[in-house]
Swiss-Prot record:
Gene3D superfamilies: Enolpyruvate transferase domain. Cell wall formation. Adds enolpyruvyl to UDP-N-acetylglucosamine. The gene is murA. The modification 2-(S-cysteinyl)pyruvic acid O-phosphothioketal is found at residue 118. It comes from Cereibacter sphaeroides (strain ATCC 17029 / ATH 2.4.9) (Rhodobacter sphaeroides). Its EC number is 2.5.1.7. One of its GO terms (biological process) is cell division. NCBIfam families: murA, PRK09369.1. Keywords: Cell cycle, Cell division, Cell shape, Cell wall biogenesis/degradation, Cytoplasm, Peptidoglycan synthesis, Pyruvate, Transferase. This is UDP-N-acetylglucosamine 1-carboxyvinyltransferase. One of its GO terms (molecular function) is UDP-N-acetylglucosamine 1-carboxyvinyltransferase activity. The active site is at residue 118. Its main location: cytoplasm. UDP-N-acetyl-alpha-D-glucosamine binds at residues 94, 123-127, 309, 331. Pfam families: EPSP_synthase.
């Protein structure tokens, strides 16, 4: 099992290109199941989760070709040969549930295993299922699988009110509704840029959608969808992660392809901590203003609030901030598993339920640490960049699910980082 060795060695300077959004691409890929015409995705990220979704779609009979080094995905679902998403593939990634709505909408039936992915709290799929039931689907959970069947004549438009904001449930319902008979209204829908990106792609395919980016999305079902070519939106989580690298280490880094509107609430916290963020012709330039970072309080919220997927990385920054910071996790349970590993590096962190109190120290110390999930893995790398001595991060297969060429991108800015094959 691979690990990553990081040596703390001062400031970072240079440019880092930001990839297409993993979470957007994982929703866009199943959209091919809605049509018998080709779907081409450009600016695709090159990640293990994308390969897993490719395997899943191919197991259903879809064709997926990776072109231009993986940055272009050519997909086609002319004739599906199977409507069963098996546990062996689905267990690797929670986004696998997103094939359910499209298959049900297009062909009227689907069998999908309950999903896997990062071990972060409960993260139930009941919101997905209730939305599909509102459209008339008959659902039966048995033997670890969701057996779904549409009513005669297909899914029907419905008013769906999500009791909690859910990105995945919004995506599943949005895709299913494009082929449902009549009008579907999604209320308390997720507002994330990935939802907007999916809606834009579906509209290119012929869907009739209004209101994406707001909490109410209206979809008028159509008889069929066509093909399209669509660029995947910039990954705001990768963007925020690499914005924190010069914030933690000092120096100045330009993030190519970055846009303020993708990370507005995050930028507000960086500004309060003493980090400068400026727009450039090609992206965003980030630098630490003067001296030590200042403590700030953070509460994770659905978009446009502070993203839960940047909480672990923000904690790494605040470990060496001047003063005491409070981080409140409002999205997922059990999402402070990186805290004990940061404590091994000398951080002062106390966790009580969904709240972590971080008292800044002058310097972290390198240590062997273990990644517990995707975002925790990169937070430990960031901490290692600013620590004295060497940090070895093990179990970095988590990292490969969400960050492409992380060692190459950071070393190009002066970081001492390399992968140790396991």
């Amino acid at each position: 099992m691979d690990s990553i060795l990081v040596k703390g060695n001062g400031e970072l300077r240079g440019q880092i290109p930001i990839a297409g959004a993993k979470n957007a691409c994982l929703a866009l890929m199943p959209a091919t199941l809605l049509s018998d015409e080709p779907l081409t995705l450009t600016n695709a990220p090159r990640l293990s989760d994308i390969r897993t979704m490719t395997q899943l779609l191919q197991s259903l009979g879809a064709e997926v070709a990776s072109l231009q080094g993986g940055q272009v995905l050519a997909l086609s679902s002319h004739a599906l040969t199977d409507h069963r998403a098996d546990y062996d593939i689905v267990r690797k990634m929670r986004a696998s549930i997103l094939v359910l709505g499209p298959m049900l909408a297009r062909d009227g039936h689907a069998v999908v295993s309950l999903p896997g992915g990062c071990a972060i709290g409960a993260r139930p799929v009941d919101l997905h299922l209730k939305a599909l039931e509102a459209m008339g689907a008959e659902l039966d959970l048995r033997d670890g699988y969701i057996h779904a069947k549409a009513p005669a004549g297909g899914l029907k438009g419905a008013r769906v009110v999500f009791p909690l904001v859910s990105v995945g449930a919004t995506e599943n319902a949005l895709m299913a509704a494009t082929l449902a008979k009549g009008t579907t209204v999604l209320e308390n829908a997720a507002r994330e840029p990935e939802i907007v990106d999916l809606a834009r792609c579906l509209r290119r395919m012929g869907a009739q959608i209004e209101g994406e980016g707001s909490s109410t999305i209206t979809i008028e079902g159509v008889d069929r969808l066509g093909g399209a070519t669509h660029p995947v939106v910039t990954d705001r989580i990768e963007l925020g992660t690499y914005m924190l690298a010069p914030a933690i280490c000092g120096g100045e880094v330009e993030l190519l392809g970055g846009r303020i509107e993708l990370v507005g609430a995050f930028c507000e916290k960086l500004d309060a901590a003493g980090i400068s963020v400026e727009e450039t012709e090609r992206g965003l330039r980030v630098a630490r203003r003067n001296g030590r970072v200042k403590a700030v309080d953070v509460m994770t919220e659905p978009f446009p609030g502070f993203p839960t997927d940047l909480q672990a990385q923000m904690m790494a920054l605040l470990c060496t901030a001047e003063g005491t910071s409070v981080l409140e996790e409002r999205i997922f349970e059990n999402r402070f598993m990186h805290a004990p590993e940061l404590i091994r590096m000398g951080a002062r962190i106390e966790v009580h339920g969904g709240t972590a109190t971080v008292t800044g120290v002058e310097k972290l110390r390198g240590a062997p640490v273990m990644a517990t999930d995707l975002r925790a893995s990169v937070s430990l790398i960031l901490a290692g960049l600013a620590a004295e001595g060497e940090t070895i991060v093990s179990r970095v297969y988590h990292l490969d699910r969400g960050y492409e060429r992380v060692e190459e991108k950071l070393s190009a800015c002066g970081a001492q980082i390399r992968r140790i094959p396991g």
